[in-house]
């Protein structure tokens, strides 16, 4: 039972952490709320980093919790602090500088970190970029202002968003993707083909099945060598080859971890006094029919709200259709469900022409996901039907070949 004398501690100052803190207060919790974040910035949303922030948006873009809001809500923040130990028996966390805090309930919202490319160690470090934090974005933005050519290693969502932003700034961009198509882990081939065409129409070169074998300094820039003998030179390289969940703390204190911190539908870990939410968690999704680890803004926020409510004693469960979005050039993409599970595709409108929706079906003909192009209303309808289990009238959709 939460009391005015209890303490709820949140480790991680991103989307999930900020929403845990805000939800605790909106639900009426009066005890101590302490949020500990590794970054010195106040909590902020990450989606703008690859888009509006690179294009010049101010430092307050995507702010989740300002100093004024934290003061008004009586939320205590330790910023620029890294938690190095969780003592479950004593119910206490310890930071790298020696500070510690006791907790009644603990929330792990530690997020994820970019997967590093070992080959990058051979290249000039001032020319290599990853994108996860506001500091990363500021450094990349500065580099793009003085660059003519950018290499993007990885044709996933982050890589393509950065490619689009850099292209808008007048930078010549080449994307090197190891797979046979872009975003192959998350969408069907029809969507990949559209994405590739969109970027080509704006002058972005995409090389598929491109295996990078070396990165080396060339003059004041660097070059990437491929296994087919081709070489691509650039001023800077952005590496976007996925992320890894930050589960080190959870592992070190003995929590169940399996491709993320294992949580139940309410965000509880294997310790009933510790909850987790966001990119670092693994939960069962009825829409996938299995345990999944989701990397999205919406999942981080939704899980955080449920975890905070559950810690206060509410009988709640996180059960939402996965949803992500991406802005590239003048196109807004919205994705619901698990389109990568599709074996068949239906369309409404003309998504390949820039406005419409692909509806993804599995082998049994069930809807498993959707991808909308400049059609948010269409996507909302599909999400609502998937969430409720209501049937979707497929008579208004046109059938395409297998996904």
What does each model-identified segment do?
Residues 2-76, 165-186, 381:
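Beta1-alpha1 glycine-rich phosphate/pyrophosphate-binding loop at the start
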Residues 50, 149, 158-214, 296-299, ...:
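Rossmann-like dinucleotide-binding cores of NAD(P)H-dependent redox enzymes
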Residues 79-90, 208-220:
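A conserved short coil-to-beta-strand element within the FAD-binding core of flavoproteins
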Residues 2-7, 26, 280-376:
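Mid-to-C-terminal Rossmann-like scaffold of FAD/NAD(P)H-dependent oxidoreductases
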Residues 1-9, 65-151, 225-227, 236-240, ...:
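FAD-binding core/adjacent interface of flavoenzyme oxidoreductases
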Residues 124-147, 220-225, 231-306:
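FAD-site-proximal beta/loop scaffold in flavoenzymes
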């Amino acid at each position: 039972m939460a009391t005015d004398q209890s303490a709820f501690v949140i480790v991680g100052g991103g989307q999930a952490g900020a929403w845990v803190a805000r939800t605790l207060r909106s639900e009426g919790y009066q005890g101590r709320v302490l949020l500990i974040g590794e970054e010195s910035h106040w909590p902020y949303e990450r989606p703008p980093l690859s888009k509006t922030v690179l294009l010049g948006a101010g430092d307050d873009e995507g702010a989740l919790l300002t100093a004024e809001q934290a003061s008004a809500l009586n939320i205590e923040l330790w910023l620029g602090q890294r938690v190095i130990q969780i003592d479950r028996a004593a119910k206490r966390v310890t930071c790298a500088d020696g500070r510690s805090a006791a907790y009644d309930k603990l929330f792990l919202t530690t997020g994820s970190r970019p997967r590093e490319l070992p080959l990058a160690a051979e290249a000039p470090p001032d020319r290599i970029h990853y994108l996860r934090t506001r500091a990363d974005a500021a450094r990349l933005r500065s580099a793009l202002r003085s660059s003519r050519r950018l290499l993007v290693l990885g044709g996933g969502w982050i890589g393509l968003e950065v490619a689009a932003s850099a292209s808008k700034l007048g930078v010549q961009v080449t994307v090197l993707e190891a797979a046979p198509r872009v975003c192959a882990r998350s969408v069907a081939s029809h969507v990949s083909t559209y994405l590739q065409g969109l970027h080509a129409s704006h002058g972005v070169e995409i090389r598929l099945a491109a295996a990078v074998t070396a990165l080396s300094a060339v003059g004041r820039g660097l070059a990437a060598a491929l296994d087919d003998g081709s070489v691509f030179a650039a001023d800077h390289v952005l590496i976007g080859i996925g992320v890894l969940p930050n589960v080190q703390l959870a592992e070190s204190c003995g929590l169940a971890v399996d491709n993320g911190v294992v949580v139940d539908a309410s965000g509880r870990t294997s310790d009933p006094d510790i909850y987790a939410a966001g990119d670092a968690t693994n939960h069962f999704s009825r829409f996938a029919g299995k345990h999944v680890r989701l990397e999205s803004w919406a999942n981080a926020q939704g899980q955080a709200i449920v975890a905070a409510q559950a810690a206060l004693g509410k009988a709640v469960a996180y059960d939402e259709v996965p949803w992500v979005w991406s802005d590239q050039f003048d196109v807004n993409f919205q994705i619901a469900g698990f389109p990568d599970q599709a074996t068949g595709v239906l369309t409404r409108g003309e998504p390949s022409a820039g406005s419409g929706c692909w509806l993804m079906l599995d082998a049994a003909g069930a809807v498993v996901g959707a991808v909308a192009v400049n059609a948010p209303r269409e996507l909302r309808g599909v999400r609502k039907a998937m969430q409720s289990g209501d049937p979707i009238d497929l008579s208004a959709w046109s059938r395409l070949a297998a996904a």
